[in-house]
Amino acid sequence: MQNMNEQQEQWQERVIQIRRVAKVVKGGKKLSFRVLVVVGNLNGCVGVGMGKAADVMSAVTKAVVDAKKQLINITLTPTNSIVHASQGRFSAAVVFLKPAASGSGVIAGGAVRSVMELAGIQNVLSKQLGGSNPLNNAKAALLALKSSSANAR
């Protein structure tokens, strides 16, 4: 039981977006909630997940489970930055990441900032181009981190 609690505490989660969606059925509209969540351990492991349910709490739980299924490992430098510049593209969203000097902080906005902070990255520059959808930007940031780590090996 102690080990289970330690594993639970090691992951941090952050809700990026809660959206009420509707399915039109014969009797009217069936409302549900779609939640976008980022999960990370602040030590080079991060994932993005989405969940949909009739109430917000169930949707958040489903999103966390989905995010933990899609975790990626990132190679961090001693200054808690990425190894080298990279680019990720998902749908219309394009995210550029560039390593920054120690003390620069996370210079990113929206969903990309959440992904960087929960991955444990403390010094990075980013630029978002194309779409402004938080889901697409978060997934583009993950792809950029993945390509940065893949090229480092």
UniProtKB/Swiss-Prot annotation:
PROSITE patterns: RIBOSOMAL_S5, S5_DSRBD. It comes from the Eukaryota. It holds the Pfam family Ribosomal_S5_C. One of its GO terms (cellular component) is small ribosomal subunit. Its main location: plastid. Keywords: Chloroplast, Plastid, Ribonucleoprotein, Ribosomal protein, RNA-binding, rRNA-binding. InterPro entries: Ribosomal_Su5_D2-typ_SF, Ribosomal_uS5, Ribosomal_uS5_bac-type, Ribosomal_uS5_C, Ribosomal_uS5_N, Ribosomal_uS5_N_CS, Ribsml_uS5_D2-typ_fold_subgr. GO terms for biological process: translation. It is found in: Plastid, Chloroplast. Residues 11-74 form the S5 DRBM domain. The keyword Ribosomal protein applies. GO terms for molecular function: rRNA binding; structural constituent of ribosome. The N-terminal domain interacts with the head of the 30S subunit; the C-terminal domain interacts with the body and contacts protein S4. The interaction surface between S4 and S5 is involved in control of translational fidelity. HAMAP family: Ribosomal_uS5_B (MF_01307_B). With S4 and S12 plays an important role in translational accuracy. Belongs to the universal ribosomal protein uS5 family. Part of the 30S ribosomal subunit. Contacts protein S4. This is Small ribosomal subunit protein uS5c.
